[in-house]
Amino acid sequence: MTKNFRVLASVALAASLAATSACSSTRDESSSSTGGSTSNLIGIAMPTRSLERWNNDGAHLDDLLKKAGYTTSLQYADNKVDQQITQLENMINQNPKVLVVASIDGTALGPVLEKAAKANVKVIAYDRLINGSPNVDYYATFDNYLVGKLQGQFIEEKLGLKDGKGPFNLEPFAGSSDDNNAKFFFNGAWDVLKPYVESGKLVIPSGKKIAGEEDWKTVSITGWKSETAQAEMDNRLNSFYTGGKKVNVVLSPNDSLALGIAQSLESKGYKPGPDYPILTGQDADLANTKNILADKQSMTVWKDTRTLGDQVAKMVDAIVKGGTVETNDTKTYNNGVKVVPAYLLPPVVVVKEDVKTKLVESGFYTADKLGL
């Protein structure tokens, strides 16, 4: 999609949403609520400003809804569960029509969502499923299992595992154990890689074996923190890669972890070139995209979160207007209480050779921003 087409599409979406929305809107600064009437208020709860993607997600959705004539309250919770709960309670007290929630801990929001239900406020889980509550009306996300599968298939192809090549040294990482998506990411990748671990074509020198269904949590990085991933990779390299032993591939579920892992590799003397480990990622964050261009990261799975925001804006509009909310998956996402109707968007693999065609020509980044 060209940049001009992308801009026109966004304008068209906003115009479509605005067609029957009459509420005035006020520009929201940082995380404060907008002023004006709350008759068409939409609450947006994002987990943190510390990751680039959540800043982009929140700003894009907020902008779309405001252009459509809705009043918004956009809140960031600094990755603190109690703070997010308080923010949601405050939003509910303002009588919103819909809450869009990207949760920090998908198991902690049951009581506050019960308050939302009693106030007749509809809830859309944004990208992260909210578990253990019957009061989640819809879920919008990318195909998270496919994200992991694409990472696993990339490793499989680049190492020639299907052709019987190996053994190779693998170090697996998983996302934060309190994020429901992390399990889908890991399982998607592990379903591809596990047979090669069992056959000995992939060896895990650190001993981080994944045998049971919940064992992925043993390699999880709490809060998706780059510095924690870096420290963990440092520990594995120092403890298990001595005497000339080298790591060949690192399964990283997202870019924030990959950033820390790349820093660890660099500090231990790994340099871009034929022997540099395969390193996966997700989100196409700016620093990681630059690392891909510099051969310090092999790939990223790009989830164009603008399209996620576009879809959620349509869902919000349908709810407010009493229309039919579009979903395309009514079977997969069981939150322990109910199967939540979901809309899944497709992720895309990005490598060095197609950064320009996929990320620049789509308008996601400018060439100048990437140094191209």
Regions found by a protein language model. Give the residues of each.
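Sec-dependent N-terminal signal peptides
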Residues: 6-15
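C-terminal motif of bacterial Sec signal peptides marking the signal peptidase cleavage site
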Residues: 16-22
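A residue-level marker of the well-folded mature domains of exported/periplasmic proteins
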Residues: 3-6, 23-372
